[in-house]
């Protein structure tokens, strides 16, 4: 896993207005020693039916939340 990779990430449980559930996320920082990553969740735009960053909502999560690798940008 490295910066720019896109994975499905399990963001549950969500609190308040956080995006939850299984989401495509892009990794923006890797903290290897702590087994943590900083990600930006993506969501589907109903107008274009494509994945977008609707709003920047960075989260730091455990690497154990990573599920399926999608691609690297």
Predicted region positions:
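Generic N-terminal initiation segments characterized by hydrophobic and/or small/turn-forming residues
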Residues: 8, 39, 63-67
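Short coil-to-beta transition motif at edge beta-strands of beta-rich domains
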Residues: 1-12
């Amino acid at each position: 896993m490295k910066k720019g990779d896109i994975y499905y990430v399990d963001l549950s449980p969500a609190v308040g207005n956080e995006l939850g559930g299984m989401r495509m996320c892009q990794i923006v920082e890797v903290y290897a020693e702590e087994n943590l990553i900083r990600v930006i969740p993506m969501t589907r735009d109903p107008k274009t039916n494509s994945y977008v960053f609707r709003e920047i909502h960075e989260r730091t999560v455990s690497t154990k939340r990573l599920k399926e690798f999608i691609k690297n940008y």
